[in-house]
């Protein structure tokens, strides 16, 4: 399932007052990976860590939301909910650096499961997160509309020492009057479990908010005996068989006072 051939690219697309940016480049260098692992208090990071990859949606006034691997890993819970499976010990041993290393490996989620929903951007102006009962209109998304812009960005991927896959990717498509984004964490531990955490983001040009839906699905492989195993590697196909464990609907409401003459988004703050 690994995706190879990393050709760096930087794509910008304007959608009204919004600038959409998709940056893709090579995996992080080992020294940078070690430094980040220390910062995150994790003994190791995913085999393929794209620390500089990002998908950003930013208003000319500076506020917005972006999706990156580092912030996603900050949401990994290293202290509870650990999966105890047959391959865990073997996998951890394979990640211990050097045969003389006697350090006690701190508990951490070696599946890199994250409930990351994006990083809010802006200083004085920021999107306001408000719970809602509104849902993204999936029928609208099925309508045949011209795709003005499409991009997919891989944030991290790991084959769990050949015991499955853990990956995080984000893709966006822009139609004439709206855009739709899907951030997907997908975990498959062969013979054990499949888990999928999806964050969907939808904005229509005439609205003063975005809708954000987060769903977490999960099933033990033992409960999927009625499903063809060939679907286990296809997130889009297997999702319908995974029970929903959690669902959160939110509005990302725009600031009330937006600069009527926003600066060129090239110079808008991105932190």
Swiss-Prot record:
GO BP terms in the entry: DNA damage checkpoint signaling; TOR signaling
GO CC field: cytosol
PTM-bearing positions, type N6-acetyllysine: 106
Region (Interaction with PPP2CA): 173-271
Residues modified to Phosphoserine: 265, 270
Alphabetical UniProt keywords: Acetylation, Cytoplasm, Phosphoprotein
Name of a matching Pfam family: TIP41
Keyword Acetylation found: yes
Key word Flavoprotein present: no
Subcellular location: Cytoplasm
GO MF term (any one): protein phosphatase inhibitor activity
Subunit organization: Interacts with PPP2CA. Interacts with PPP2CB, PPP4C and PPP6C. Interacts with IGBP1; the interaction is dependent on PPP2CA. Associates with a protein phosphatase 2A PP2A(C):IGBP1 complex. Interacts with PPP4C and PPP4R2.
Function: May be a allosteric regulator of serine/threonine-protein phosphatase 2A (PP2A). Inhibits catalytic activity of the PP2A(D) core complex in vitro. The PP2A(C):TIPRL complex does not show phosphatase activity. May play a role in the regulation of ATM/ATR signaling pathway controlling DNA replication and repair.
Assigned protein family: Belongs to the TIP41 family.
Record's protein name: TIP41-like protein
Gene: Tiprl
């Amino acid at each position: 399932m690994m995706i190879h051939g990393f050709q760096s690219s930087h794509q910008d697309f304007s959608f009204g007052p919004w600038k959409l940016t998709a940056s893709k480049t090579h995996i992080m260098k080992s020294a940078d990976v070690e430094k980040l692992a220390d910062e995150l208090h994790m003994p190791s990071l995913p085999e393929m860590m794209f620390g500089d990859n990002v998908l950003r949606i930013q208003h000319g006034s500076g506020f917005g939301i972006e999706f990156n691997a580092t912030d996603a890993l900050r949401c990994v819970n290293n202290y509870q909910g650990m999966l105890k499976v047959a391959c865990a010990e073997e996998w951890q041993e394979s990640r211990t650096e050097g045969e003389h290393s006697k350090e006690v490996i701190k508990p951490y989620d070696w599946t890199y499961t994250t409930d990351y929903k994006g990083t809010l951007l802006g200083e004085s102006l920021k999107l306001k997160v408000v719970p809602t009962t509104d849902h993204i209109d999936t029928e609208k998304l099925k309508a045949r509309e011209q795709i003005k812009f499409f991009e997919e960005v891989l944030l991290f991927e790991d084959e769990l020492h050949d015991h499955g896959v853990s990956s995080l990717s984000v893709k966006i498509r822009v139609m004439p009057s709206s855009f739709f984004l899907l951030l997907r964490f997908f975990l498959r531990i062969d013979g054990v479990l499949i888990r999928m955490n999806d964050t969907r983001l939808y904005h229509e040009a005439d609205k003063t908010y975005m809708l954000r839906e987060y769903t977490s699905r999960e099933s033990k492989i033992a409960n999927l005996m009625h499903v063809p195993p060939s679907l286990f590697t296809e997130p889009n196909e297997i999702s319908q068989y995974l029970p929903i464990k959690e669902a959160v609907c939110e509005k990302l409401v725009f600031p009330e006072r937006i600069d009527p003459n926003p600066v060129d988004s090239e110079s808008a703050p991105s932190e």
